[in-house]
């Protein structure tokens, strides 16, 4: 796929991210990274940090890794509950502590808010600041798979509003740059809780190749919106001629949005 798209793009302007699941269970991430680096593509990973020790981090950096995101979903009890592993919190914190010492890599921490960690967000904020975290993204959990069947993973409307106000407070305070995730239009909170006005880039400027080869705008989007599969379709052809549901927004031009130029 990379060699197919290379004649059509400026590699310096295309970011490749390995996510999961857990990216670091792959032993060949560095080999893939070196090939991307050879072709001058910046690349990064999203990780739970459990497998990220000093040796592995040095190996990733030597392979040209530009960015990394670490998931930390609350203080120890809440994080380990969500991850289902009593060592997860320790692994994530150790990974964050290592990254705080690095000067050349772009990195941040993401937190998925749920009923188990909601009450500890203020405490978690202070803990992240103490660890040296500068950038913190806060997500809610999309209700699919296990999340749709586990009430503790969902927050209510009042809690959601509190989170937006909390992020706004963090940004005004200036001790850590907090942002809400990319999902959803936020009404009057737009422009206050993240760095840009909401616009979903799935199928517009981003695409995903999933574990089975499916071509999607984003891993969070349902399978019935997949556009093809790299094992039987040309990625460039799919990109140039597919994604019509993503790019044609006429269905949204109604009511107060009828005359929108976006």
Cite the ranges covered by each PLM segment.
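Residue-level recognition of the N-termini of beta-strands and the immediately preceding loop/turn
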Residues: 12-16, 107, 254
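Structural motif corresponding to alpha-helix initiation and N-cap regions
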Residues: 26, 30, 53-55, 118-122, ...
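Short, solvent-exposed turn/loop segments enriched in Gly/Ser/Thr/Pro and often Arg
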Residues: 21, 181, 262
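Conserved alpha-helical substructure of the radical SAM core
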Residues: 1-67, 155
């Amino acid at each position: 796929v990379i060699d197919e798209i290379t004649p059509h793009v400026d590699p310096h302007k295309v970011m490749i991210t390995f996510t999961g699941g857990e990216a670091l269970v792959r032993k060949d991430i560095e080999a893939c990274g070196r090939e991307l680096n050879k072709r001058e593509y910046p690349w990064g990973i999203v990780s739970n940090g459990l497998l990220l020790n000093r040796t592995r981090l040095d190996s990733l950096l030597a392979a040209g890794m530009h960015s990394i995101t670490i998931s930390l979903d609350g203080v120890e009890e809440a994080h380990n509950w969500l991850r289902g592993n009593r060592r997860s919190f320790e692994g994530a914190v150790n990974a964050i502590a290592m990254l705080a010492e690095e000067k050349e890599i772009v990195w941040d921490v993401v937190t998925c808010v749920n009923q188990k960690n909601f009450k500890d967000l203020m405490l978690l904020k202070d803990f992240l600041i103490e660890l040296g975290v500068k950038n913190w993204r806060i997500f809610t959990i999309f209700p699919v798979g296990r999340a749709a069947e586990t009430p503790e993973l969902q927050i209510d409307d009042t809690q959601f509003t509190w989170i937006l106000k909390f992020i706004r407070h963090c940004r005004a305070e200036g001790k850590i740059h907090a942002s809400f995730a990319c999902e959803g239009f936020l009404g009057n909170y737009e422009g206050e809780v993240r760095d840009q006005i909401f616009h979903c880039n799935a199928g517009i400027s981003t695409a995903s190749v999933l574990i089975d080869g499916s071509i999607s705008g984003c891993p969070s989007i349902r399978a019935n919106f997949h556009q093809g599969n790299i094992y039987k379709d040309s990625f460039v052809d799919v990109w140039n001629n597919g994604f019509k549901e993503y790019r044609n927004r006429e269905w949204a031009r109604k009511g107060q949005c009828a005359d929108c130029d976006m």
